[in-house]
Amino acid sequence: MSWQEKIDAALDARRVADALRRRYPVAQGAGRWLVADDCQYLNFSSNDYLGLSHHPQIIRAWQQGAEQFGVGSGGSGHVSGYSVAHQALEEELAEWLGYSRALLFISGFAANQAVIAAMMAKEDRIVADRLSHASLLEAASLSPSPLRRFAHNDVTHLARLLASPCPGQQLVVTEGVFSMDGDSAPLEEIQQVTQQHDGWLMVDDAHGTGVIGEQGRGSCWLQKVKPELLVVTFGKGFGVSGAAVLCSDTVADYLLQFARHLIYSTSMPPAQAQALRASLGVIRSDEGDTRREKLAALITRFRAGVQDLPFTLADLCSAIQPLIVGDNSRALQLAEKLRQQGCWVTAIRPPTVPAGTARLRLTLTAAHEMQDIDRLLEVLHGNG
C-alpha cells in the first residue's frame, strides 16, 4: 500500500462511519454567542465556563503585557524565555493551590505528555482510568512503562491492578472532571488506594480548575486531596490557554531537567502570563464566586428541563452536560437541526468517545442567561 492509498483508506473509513472530523471557521467562538458565516448562534460548545475570554480586565492585562514585554517570549525558559511575568504567575498559582511549585506549559496536552515522559521508566507502571483524556493515554502508550487501564472510576479494579507485582514505581492517572462525560473522579478513594500501594497520583483537572471548589480551586481542593502531580489548564475556566503542573520543589527541579516539552519549546508569551494573572485574580474574587453561582443556577435550570427527553442523561452537575444519542449519524443530524434553529452544539463521536456512545456535548457557561437555557430546552424538545 502506498502512502496515498494508506491515507485515502483511513479517511474513507472515517467517512463510512460518519466519524470524519471537520473544522468550521468562526468569527467568534467563545462566550455567549458564536458567529459563523455572518450568522449568530447561542454557543453551547465552548469550554469558556466562566465567560472570562472577553473580560475587559483580562484583555487589558494582555494588551499591557504585550506593550511591556512584546508579543513573544523569544525562547525556551531555559535560555531567555522565562520572564518575571512567568515567575509571578507560577508563584501565585502555587500559593492558590497549596503547592510548593508550579511550572508553566504551552498547553495541557504538552504538560501531560511532558510529565509522563519524564517520570516513567520501563520498570515502572502507569495505571490510568479508561476514560482519561487522549493526551494522558497517548503519553502512557508512548512511554516505556506498561500501561494498565482500570474501569471508569472503579476503585476496586484500580486496587487489583496496583496489587499485582511491579519492579518499579506506579503512577495512577485520572481526571478531576472528565471532558466528555462531565462526571467527577472519586479522588479521595483513588488517593487512598494509591497510597496503600506506595504509588503516586497524577490528576488532570482541566475542567474543574477555576469552576468548582472554594475560590475555584478545583476538584482536588473540593475533595480534600493533594496529588503528587496536579495538572491545571487555562483554556477552560481561565478563558485563555496554556497549562501548569503543580508539584513539590524536588519534582519541579526534576522536571526542569528532564521534561523535554518544557526544555525544548518556546515558552508562552509573557503577555499571556499577565493575562492569566488577571484571570486568576477574577477567579479568586467575589466576582468569581458570582460567576460560579450563576453557572450552577444555569446547570440546575437545564437539568430540570431536560429530564423527559429521550436521551441518556448522566446524574452530574458540571458545566459539561452530554446527551448520549448512540448512533453517529443521528448525533450529526441532531447537531445540524439545533444549529438551524440557532443553537451551536457539537456532535462527539468515536474514537473520541467509546463506540455506540455518540453524543451531543453541551457546555454551559456563566456568559449564558436563563433565556438562553430556555431556548436550548425548547429546541431540544422540538427535536427529541
UniProtKB/Swiss-Prot annotation:
A GO BP annotation: biotin biosynthetic process
Biochemical pathway: Cofactor biosynthesis; biotin biosynthesis
N6-(pyridoxal phosphate)lysine: residues carrying this PTM: K236
Cofactor list: pyridoxal 5'-phosphate
Keywords: Biotin biosynthesis, Pyridoxal phosphate, Transferase
Family: Belongs to the class-II pyridoxal-phosphate-dependent aminotransferase family. BioF subfamily.
Function, as annotated: Catalyzes the decarboxylative condensation of pimeloyl-[acyl-carrier protein] and L-alanine to produce 8-amino-7-oxononanoate (AON), [acyl-carrier protein], and carbon dioxide.
Protein name: 8-amino-7-oxononanoate synthase
UniProt organism field: Escherichia coli O127:H6 (strain E2348/69 / EPEC)
